[in-house]
């Protein structure tokens, strides 16, 4: 919500200022983070007000994969530690993964959320990677089964799962301080990692989050996957046949804003095939950049309508009110 207001300080309650901005900018969803959580009661009230302001039409999401770094744990509003993905993979198995999904979904639903950007399905390809620290592990087949069961648990609690991140960060390294995130994987290498994402989608995940990994051996340059039609359109849409919602990873990452303007990044993501753009540092410039691109013919109305159809389909079929 702070992006709507153009401020840096995390918003912990919403009122007329946010209501006015939601009327000005008809966004499809709001994502909250730990900084937005001041208390359990305040969080529930904020989520409720956001839906009231928009006639219950928003996706309201958070990233919670369980474990000690859950935003509900780190903010201090919950002491209910749900098994982390790493713990699930090491000792709890498929039944534990489903139970974790149920528990995550139940907690999110308690506060009014309808989206969880989980599970993290990346295959760990090197020691110390985010996939090793927070994911299921190194085996794609095992990751696939566990991801499927987490998604089933979330879905059974009426929470939309957003499986992440494709392509995975499993072997990526960052160039310099805040530079681009590079992986030397080929398209054949990526095929070895499809299963966790595809199984999560088959189990009911409504979102696929695209990473900012640059894959020069696939593209020939260092343009991030989130801005690459070779990834989103050629692989996800055409090869996989996926017609759900594609959302970018957070666009306030240094590997994006140090290389592209807010408008360039937003338009590039839509051109590449993304449907939703997650959390830019300057929402107004991103939003207006897309409008300008449509006016100039760089983006067609047909392309925008494709994304709107995917978004409305999830909201309507799943009865997110207002659709």
Q: What residues fall within each predicted segment?
A:
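Active-site-proximal loop/short-helix segments
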Residues: 74-79, 114-133, 160, 164-181, ...
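Second-shell residues forming the walls of enzyme active-site clefts
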Residues: 30, 39-52, 58, 68-70, ...
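Substrate-binding cleft of extracellular glycoside hydrolase catalytic domains
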Residues: 54-101
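Active-site mouth loops of central-metabolism enzymes
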Residues: 2-15, 82-99, 179-192, 254-259
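N-terminal hydrophobic targeting/anchoring segments and the immediately downstream early-domain regions
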Residues: 1-60, 64-74, 321
